Amino acid sequence: MRSKENKRVEFGAKVNNIQIDGISFIEHHSFEAFNEGTRLKQCVEYQQSLTGVPVTRIGMDTIYANNENRKYCTENSITTNFVRKGLGPKDEPAEISSARRIIGNLRATVMEGSFGNQKQHYGVGRIAARNRHSETLQLFFGIHIITVR
């Protein structure tokens, strides 16, 4: 069960998506609650296994901005849209702050927009399945059918 302030409660499976050039992939789904903020490393590894290309930039929701993920991104030279903790260095290049802003805006428009489309037009937000197997199939087709359009 998931909820957001001022939003209706959602039941059923919880899905952790990644997007590569606008195409959604299901990285993890479960009928048990999980914290997607702890799955950054798995998301990066999954994307690298799909594309064969090292990840250099990631746009993520604020739930991913924990210390462990910040350290992982720094160690692997991955630019993120995370807001800095504390005061930033005075000599930070304008390109870095500009990249953070662009990555954040792209994530917000593309990723959140795809969630809205999946829920509204492809039935992902509706309770239509009567068991876990049917719901898993509905999620798969609802998320992946948008790719072929």
At which residue positions do the language-model features occur?
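Polybasic low-complexity intrinsically disordered regions
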Residues: 1-56, 62, 70-72
